[in-house]
């Protein structure tokens, strides 16, 4: 018998013993056949061909195999015996004892006597009958035990991982509860200390009414010694600050970096790194932990309010002889903990220092900072009181003026006055609201902004795409593992091939889920010098392995269904129906967990600086045609070559756009006015600007209808389907979804077939027919995943990107002569990359073209990983090598 038939017979060992499996080539007059004897053994029978009709064709063969199966159940090693019969002679047992045909001796082994009795009842013949029976241990018994061990180990690992995560979270939970229950003095160790002179001073300051609470009609308002007390307060606080000056480094004039929806901004210091909240700042590792109450607003904005219990502000000049347009800094202290903090206030539009006090802080000693234009020594008591009374109310989070072009910046700031209050002076320091603006510091990059935003999202309870995929796969794996064992038990009891095949399919699903989880973990590993792109394509390899596993198992099921079409067995339709119904419900739950929607591997969605808004207009780019840039003085060009977007004031060639207006509408009006003066504006086309009297080079396509993004030199239409709410779909999650969908359809078919068998038991052929149909359906459902995975591995153009339209858009940029060697591929799902050569007119416009092309690819086509090389007509020979010509064959070069 071929080895494949033998292996398959052991794989289907739950079949009835009389199920015929295969033949062995005849050897003379002897024929050998092998039969499955259940989960423990198989029986190979060798008999004489001459007695085939007289013995083996009768129904006694089934009885012989049934009796031999009982012997096989107790057999753990191979046993062979020969039964012979000659006329009226008795049958000799394998142990050498004789068994008379009329009856059985009490000492004879029951199994052997039963087999001998059936042989003795065979038709009397004159020749000798040789029947060799060999009981072999099941080949798959060891593999079945191994598979049980593997499944048990996986379940144990999953249980241990959940238990370990729960145990790791217990100390944090208990410590947080304990820290809330313990007094503040005991948290820091030691007994409660008596209040110092500093805290006594703060408590006295709390008793003094706020300058805003005074009314002009109060007769005693002018006689209260507020100014003198404020001076004494200032002197005391200066002494306290002098003692702690070593612990608070002075801030430099470096710009701070901020990220969308981040509650803290960072400012580089001369000695360390100071992390500043919108209203307070402290040096990491120096100041003790402050006690700040955080409360979540009930509105949609979800802005966190950070309130200090008691603060006392004292002025401190941190720039010394720096230019006057520097941010004012305050030393703030907590009356109960003597913690020193720093509060930064931004300059106003004129370059001066605004005098402001946080309205949400507790009433405290409010001292205005020293101003170069108005020395403090010249202020009298009335002037000081007037200045204190004129303190404006400061919002909890000031909006970033330059971030007005970013929709995420205006989230939570609906007050027009608040938007008009703040602008950036010459110092270029970011401040106020640190949520909703892209990084403006020279060392900040878009990647760091995205990483900080992902950290913020994790802290706020938001899940990233990978975390969401991992959670779904873990839940689906648990459901799949539990129900797989249910179907295995029910399939053995009901003798249903459809249930067993569905259980096998669930086993493949479980393996696919585990492979997908492993691929997700590997894809998060960062790149190294040997793997510069990282391990993103491990996700693709995992999806391919999962698809191949489905194909192999489906082929086995089709093979088994073919045999059941020939000889349908008896099936318990009732048990099969209820098990299939339960499986349908379980698969419905799994498909709900893994529910995804696909937009193709290249149809990634645009996001605003890691935020939840779509891309908004750029405002800080200058037109190269109207105002050529100087190559040596263009930080925007250097940033563009480094892969950055040039929309912040540090990168922008000019700061006029940053200061043009107080809100987004005013900024647009001012920009329109400048466009009218310089002759720009009017009607613009895709990929570049066009004058008022000039038509676009080609009309907008139908797919270009949607929101627009305009700048001084680039006008691109953003597709409406680039909605930030739709994240790109993970390929492993889609593969798992197809697994679960195939199981759901197969369970529905099994339920229908079981209902028919339950109604008409003689319709047992519906079981293999159902298996055959839905196995083929599962094969076809995997073709889409296979196609996209091969497209990524072969570095094909992503499905959602039109390379020809992209090349035309690049050609329409001002100063571009030719575009060749354009390559667009995907590192993994949702990670497209681009590389191309752009031939420009001259060196003067090279940097401008590079910047525009980078922004065009990143904003319209959502290709964030771009490599654009600018060439000149004189260097065209370097791009005419054999490798370049081979790559450019599939696409013709477009010329102006």
From Swiss-Prot:
A GO MF term: zinc ion transmembrane transporter activity
Topology class, membrane: Multi-pass membrane protein
Keyword Ion transport in annotation: yes
Keyword Transport: yes
InterPro entries from the UniProt entry: Cation_efflux, Cation_efflux_TMD_sf, CDF/SLC30A
Vacuolar side: 494-502, 561-573, 759-762
Domain of life (superkingdom): Eukaryota
Topological region Cytoplasmic: 1-472, 524-539, 595-737, 784-896
Region Disordered, residue ranges: 82-104, 205-227, 255-329, 621-707
Biased segments, Basic and acidic residues type: 82-91, 303-322, 656-680
Entry GO CC: cytoplasmic vesicle membrane; plasma membrane; vacuolar membrane
Observed effect of gene inactivation: Conditional knockdown results in reduced growth rates in the presence of extracellular Zn(2+).
Location of the protein in the cell: Vacuole membrane; Cytoplasmic vesicle membrane
Positions with biased composition (Low complexity): 210-225, 255-266
Disulfide bonds: none
Pfam families hit by this protein: Cation_efflux
Similarity comment: Belongs to the cation diffusion facilitator (CDF) transporter (TC 2.A.4) family. SLC30A subfamily.
Function according to Swiss-Prot or TrEMBL: Vacuolar zinc transporter that is probably involved in the transfer of zinc ions from the cytosol to the vacuole for intracellular storage. Plays an essential role in extracellular zinc tolerance.
Protein name, entry field: Vacuolar zinc transporter TgZnT
